[in-house]
A protein has these predicted regions:
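Signature for HUH/AEP ssDNA processing cores
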Residues: 1-79, 88-93, 145-194
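Metal-dependent DNA replication initiation modules
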Residues: 65-149, 161
């Protein structure tokens, strides 16, 4: 059971925080007031970065953050990916930390089954869900899992996101520290020695 908060609608303070990412925050807020059910594309890199994960794996990461860690900032789902809002600079630092952890790897790698994480930072933009949660979110549509509710939300940095990703991967995929067995090796039964 997850202790993730069930906040599906952004508060006015959260909307102001999201709008502060753009060049014209007042225009963004006015647009949202006119169309509260419309998603919007916002730039990353100044106020927040976004780490995108496949939705099931992302949910495991989110559960780790809330059950065993410090919690999370805003989190959204868009087109089968979970968008974890992170501290600015995370998109630049996290890929090197994942490489250090031997994340993903090639087809024969021991971590090949671990899903890729996409990092959106300076120069990137993401589609954020509508401010209102809506009564029934469409499957595959965008919605908030944890909507922004304050003008200055806490955002996890790259080390916290790495911590959650590694723990979620360990729970989801058995990663052995031993190399795969050689199928051509000759094995002798020594239990029946005389």
């Amino acid at each position: 059971m997850s202790s993730t908060p069930n906040v599906t609608c952004a508060t006015p303070e959260g909307a102001a925080w999201l709008a502060s990412t753009g060049t014209y925050p007042r225009s963004t807020l006015a647009n949202w007031q006119e169309h509260p059910d419309a998603p919007l594309v916002l730039p990353c890199g100044t106020v927040f970065d976004v780490v995108s994960a496949p939705v099931v794996f992302g949910r495991r990461m989110l559960d780790r953050l809330w059950d065993e860690g410090p919690g999370s900032g805003p989190v959204a789902v868009f087109r089968g990916r979970m968008l974890l809002f992170a501290a600015p600079g995370t998109a630049q630092r996290l890929p090197s930390l994942l490489t250090w952890e031997e994340w993903g790897g090639g087809h024969g790698s021991r971590t090949a089954a671990v899903p890729p994480l996409l990092c959106h930072g300076t120069g990137d933009a993401v589609t954020v869900p509508a401010l209102s949660g809506g009564d029934s979110p469409t499957p595959g549509g965008s919605r908030w899992l944890v909507a922004p509710d304050t003008r200055h939300p806490w955002l996890p940095g790259p080390e916290v996101v790495l911590w959650a990703a590694v723990r979620a991967a360990r729970a989801a995929v058995r990663i052995s520290i031993f190399p795969p067995a050689d199928q051509d090796a000759k094995v002798y039964d020594v239990s029946r020695r005389r």
